[in-house]
Amino acid sequence: MRLIFGALIISLTYMYYYEVHGTELRCKCLDGKKLPPKTIMLGNFWFHRESGGPRCNNNEYFLYLGGGKKHGPGVCLSPHHPFSKWLDKRNDNRWYNVNVTRQPERGPGKITVTLVGLKE
């Protein structure tokens, strides 16, 4: 009987700790720490969108520096950022390796996003 009661207490303690300290059910991007919509970075990046979960109602958008196999540090994007809108057009949660370049012949501030590779 003590063994069953002890196992029950341990499992309840674990579930409480998991609920309080688990981060996968929370939003990864805090509202104040997002790349503003007017900030455009040029270069080779990984873009990724994660659908909202049970505790995060909105989609979250990420830009990872370094276009190689290893991702560099990640940056959260605003939902109104042009890169976030580019990801919304694809409507999936795949990783996109893209090259962002400036296109002065199209006008001031115009950019082109060229798809380099995909990863599930």
Curated annotation (Swiss-Prot):
The keyword Nucleus does not apply. Keywords: Host-virus interaction, Inhibition of host chemokines by virus, Viral immunoevasion. GO terms for biological process: immune response. It comes from the Viruses. SUPFAM superfamilies: Interleukin 8-like chemokines. Transmembrane segments: none annotated. One of its GO terms (cellular component) is extracellular region. One of its GO terms (molecular function) is chemokine activity. Belongs to the intercrine alpha (chemokine CxC) family. Acts as a functional chemokine, inducing calcium mobilization, chemotaxis, and degranulation of neutrophils. Contributes to the induction of neutrophil chemotaxis by interacting with host CXCR1 and CXCR2 receptors. Interacts with host CXCR1 and CXCR2. This is Chemokine vCXCL1. It comes from Human cytomegalovirus (strain Merlin) (HHV-5).
